[in-house]
Amino acid sequence: MEEPLQFGDGGRLFGILTLPSRSHRKAPGLPVFVFLNAGLLHRVGPRRLYVHLARDLSRMGFSSLRVDLAGKGDSPPRPGLTNQQSVAADYDEILRVLESRLARVPLILAGLCSGADNAIRLAPKDSRVVGLVLLDPVCSPDDGFSARAFVSKYTNTARYVAWLKRRFEAPTTQPRGSQEQIDPLTLRDAPTLEQLRDAPLEQLRSAFESIRERDGRVLSVFTQYALQYYNQAGQLARVLGVAGYQQFCTELFWPQAEHTYTLELHRRRLIDAIKTWAGGFIRSRIDVTRNIGTD
């Protein structure tokens, strides 16, 4: 079931609340997914990714809220506030509307690119957040990053094939201007290596440690967009150095997938990965319920 919500001060925020039917409620106390905007994209996500995710998750028993943050989609901007201040104010309104509709519930914050950045900033401050789905979050390079990047650049046969095609093939087709185009750079300015090396890890580490302390879970997925700063599965774990990382974190590296999951194959793979990851919360809640029943 999907319900449009207009909420917040003066009804300035707009979102879609997706609820599972009674037949799909598999475990009590499941966390609610909150999908955060990425850059200029509104609540549907790139190529309706968040819509499909919300509906698939509802069939697993999860509720979710897809919301237009201020200045995106159908929500007007908050004049006089910085982006971080505006996101913080929006988040307070999100918490209030969820509490009024679903009571005080645990949350999973999910976002692509700048949406992941916002989730990382918000998680340590809110004890309700027990899960993070981070799509192409920022990650500092580790000691082996530059060497791996060098080897990959000069051993990538696709690079030479593409050069030969450009060199010898005359253009035979017109650009397909009618197709939907989403420029990843409108979602977040790609950080330089210098910025990444200088960026403190405290905020990112704090987000992961807060989830660990709440017995939660984190899913991080990196695509070809992240090759500018991430090029090997496990790099995030090494950079963070968070105790017990493997026990509560899933880290995936899909260098063939585009940042906005242009191909249906890659979108389906991502949705399946998130559903598999989310299933861990169902198993945990069922175990808790059984333990309570046997006490």
Spans of model-derived segments:
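Conserved alpha/beta-hydrolase
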Residues: R48-P76
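Serine-hydrolase catalytic core
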Residues: F7-G8, V51-L53, S152, T157-G293
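Active-site glycine-rich loops that stabilize anionic/oxyanionic intermediates
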Residues: L30, L36-G45
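Alpha/beta-hydrolase active-site loop signature
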Residues: L40, L69-G73, C139, E258
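N-terminal cap/lid segment of alpha/beta-hydrolase-fold proteins
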Residues: M1-P31, L263
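Catalytic nucleophile-loop/oxyanion-hole region of alpha/beta-hydrolase
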Residues: K72-L102
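Alpha/beta-hydrolase
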Residues: L36-N37, L69, L135, F222, ...
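Primarily recognizes the serine-hydrolase "nucleophile elbow" in alpha/beta-hydrolase
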Residues: D92-N156, S210
